[in-house]
């Protein structure tokens, strides 16, 4: 017995004449909308200043508590399930091996990348900690809780790597250092290595070196867009965002020099018009 029903449908043509092909001009990013002043820079969250109570699960129906890194970080749903702060099970496996940590602030990320769920132009839609990042919820968890849980597992920890993801915010560089120090004060980076997903816009060579000196093992740069033109169009001036192709490459080359072969990398997204 089969469960596939033949609907007499034929496969659409592939390539430039296919239904799923999006020409470059159609993929032009929408102009960022104007956010009302009373919704800018996390104003509702900061004005009401609701104290957080432990782990925060994204909820669009309530005002988000006032949470900031380095005391709080967000993590992927898969990481939260594996850590034990979220209920749930994952298809075909019992856990994720990488603990992804994302810096968080009421003001949110001050960049405005066209495709990102955390972009500045979305700040009127939802509080920052409620926004969808990479399609799933990212609960906010006290850093102390994370370190306590991972340290208590010792050699039996399900995590094989931890990654700190920076955002574009004035505190991001210093708070990445604080999160890294808190982690390495309790957890040996030789046991669970640490990666940095960087924000080159706010960084210099000394920032890269400091992270290496503090125990980071791998340093990555999210170029995302594969060409200078696409980068500027989707992450730079084209969307009123501060990122610059040349600056990203400058920091990437710093990482090459400081972290060495096979210890630095780039994130790219296919399908943005390249």
Predicted regions and their residues:
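Short, catalytically relevant binding-site loops at active-site mouths
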Residues: 227-228, 271-273
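Short, electropositive alpha-helical surface patch
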Residues: 176-185, 220, 273-274
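N-terminal [4Fe-4S]-dependent radical SAM core
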Residues: 3-7, 18-21, 28, 33-112, ...
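Short, conserved beta-strand edge motifs with alternating hydrophobic and charged residues
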Residues: 265-271
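Core AdoMet radical
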Residues: 121-145, 152-175, 190-207, 211-249, ...
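Surface-exposed amphipathic alpha-helices with a cationic face
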Residues: 180-189, 212, 252-260
